[in-house]
Every structure is written in structure tokens, then in C-alpha cells.
């Protein structure tokens, strides 16, 4: 039984109403499992890890496995779309389109459950993309080991592309990210007696200024990186010298090499400031599973060639995005390709008004199913 467009739209609307935060997607996971259990089971094996669902399709040839991953979590956003199928969970919304992601994955899975593939396939319904490096945690759990893909694919919806348009590029699609948390600890005191205190506002200001040299003086200017310090907190009132300064920010880089370089420079600068101001330092640079999504040359060339030459697919080559995606961790372990699916919305990802066009669902299912069928036939393993 291949799921039809009206069924997929109903599934999407059902999922849209029950968004849940990462590793708390219990209702979502149960709903997905209900749909999966309704598909032909002859070649299916299913297992769960926390709120993740792994579905393995036994192909005619069992010495190669193609993977497909979707994320399943929502965001802590209060929905304001006014849709009749708006979120029923207060303060929760599928504001990043993961309801679209899941629905497309179910549509593709339903085809291959009904038409046995040439090679094995593993479908990964992954929790906690937004907040907790769910892909990395699932991979490191070992639950994927027996069904480990030899190559893997995933999509992300794109409000800026027309509904159903496929976008992709060789190289990096999403930047790798790293959170910066720095605290300088000195000594508070009266504003009139600075010599009896150790002013962390000044220390923090020096840190902010020196961080600006990383992009301009340590990184190849041809390569895109961003270091943003978005939070600076120190002091309580104007006549008290602050003994503590908390600074938080983010790193964005299109290669893991540059991400690690920037992390090293941030740490070195923070340690230098602490030494020069004779203060204590607490620093946490947290990347987790948010590696750059660096598409594999082989799988991406095959993907782009298929999409470019398929009459029923509108394809565009896209630029890299400086946003993060935890598929970067999986693709650092398994060669593969991530791509965009256009959903044509005037509102951006993570907006409380995001309302993807539903015609993108079937167009996405058809394009991806067509590619995976073609990929299966072209492989000679």
C-alpha cells in the first residue's frame, strides 16, 4: 500500500497538531509507529530507541544498505498561523517543518514497503534535532549498527523555494555550529575604589573586542565563518564594580576544520584575558552533533544529475546556509547527501507563522522515491 496524497495530507495535519520537544516525542513516535504498522510488513523490521523509530527494509540483495533520515521534533514556539489544524500543545509548534519531513519520509517508505527494493534500506525517524544532538546520540547508542547504511539521505524544507522544488549543492549545505559560554570571575567592589576590586566588565569588553580578530585575521577570507556574541551580562547597578561577567555566543563555519580552529582561538583568547586580568575563567564550547553538513561528492553528483534530468522535478543549485543541522554528525560518519524541499512560505523557518504549502509533500515524495529507485538500479554491489 503506497500512501496517497490525501492520506499524506491528513498525516501531516495530524502530526502538525502534536509537536513535542526533543526526546519527549512520545505521542509523535506512537503516531508514526501506527502508520508504519499499517504498511505491508513482509520485508519490514522495526525497532525503537527512546523516541526514535528505525525501520529496516530487507532488499533482494543484502550486501548494501541505503539510509533515509527524518527528524521528528518540534520547537518551543507558540503557533500563530490560525490554521484549523494548529498545534494542540501550548507553547509547542512544528515551526521548522519537521511535520513535512516526517510525512515525506512516510510516503517514501510506503512505496518501498509495497515494492521490495533491490538493496536494503534503513529509514531513521530521529528525535531531538533541534536541541539535543539526537542524531549523534542515536549513532553512539549502537542501535543503528546492525542496520547501518552505506550511504544516507535527508531533506530540509525551504520556505524560500517554490513548493516541490529540490535544491542541493556539492560541498557544504549547512554550517557546523558551536555554542560559546564564557564566564570571567574577578572581585566586585565599590565604584569609587576600583583598586580594591577586579572589574569583569573591562575583562569581558576586552574579550569581545579580541574575538573580532578571529574572522578577520585567522580565517581564509574566501571561506565563510561567523562568530557572534549575542549575550553579555555583568553588574547590577552603576556604582558597583562587577565581579562576574557572562558572555554567550555561537560559532558558524562551513567546514569542521574551521570550526575547530575558531574554537581553539576562542579558548586561547579567553585564557589570555583571564591571565592578563588575574581572574578565574569558566569556559564551555559545546558543539555536540552539529557538524557541518558536508555532502559526499559521489552521492551528491548522482542525486543532482538525476534531479536535473527528471522532467517532473524542478531543481536548483543552492548556496550554503549558515544555520545548523545535526544531520552533519551522521553525514560525517556515513557518506550521503542532504537537500532542500521547497515549501513556498513568506515566513522563515522557526517563525510562529510558518505554513508550508502542502502540495510540496507529494512532489517531494515522488522526486525522492524516483531518485532512490534510480539509485538502487544504478548500483552494482
UniProtKB/Swiss-Prot annotation:
Signal peptide: none annotated. It comes from the Bacteria. GO terms for biological process: diaminopimelate biosynthetic process; lysine biosynthetic process via diaminopimelate. Keywords: Amino-acid biosynthesis, Diaminopimelate biosynthesis, Hydrolase, Lysine biosynthesis. It is an enzyme of class 3 (hydrolase). Its EC number is 3.5.1.47. The active site is at 71, 130 (proton acceptor). Pathway: Amino-acid biosynthesis; L-lysine biosynthesis via DAP pathway; LL-2,6-diaminopimelate from (S)-tetrahydrodipicolinate (acetylase route): step 3/3. InterPro entries: AcetylDAP_deacetylase, Amidohydrolase, Bact_exopeptidase_dim_dom, Peptidase_M20, Peptidase_M20_dimer. Coiled coil: none annotated. Pfam families: M20_dimer (PF07687), Peptidase_M20 (PF01546). One of its GO terms (molecular function) is N-acetyldiaminopimelate deacetylase activity. It catalyses: N-acetyl-(2S,6S)-2,6-diaminopimelate + H2O = (2S,6S)-2,6-diaminopimelate + acetate. HAMAP family: DapEL. Belongs to the peptidase M20A family. N-acetyldiaminopimelate deacetylase subfamily. Catalyzes the conversion of N-acetyl-diaminopimelate to diaminopimelate and acetate. PANTHER family: N-ACETYLDIAMINOPIMELATE DEACETYLASE, PEPTIDASE M20 FAMILY MEMBER. This is N-acetyldiaminopimelate deacetylase. It comes from Ligilactobacillus salivarius (strain UCC118).
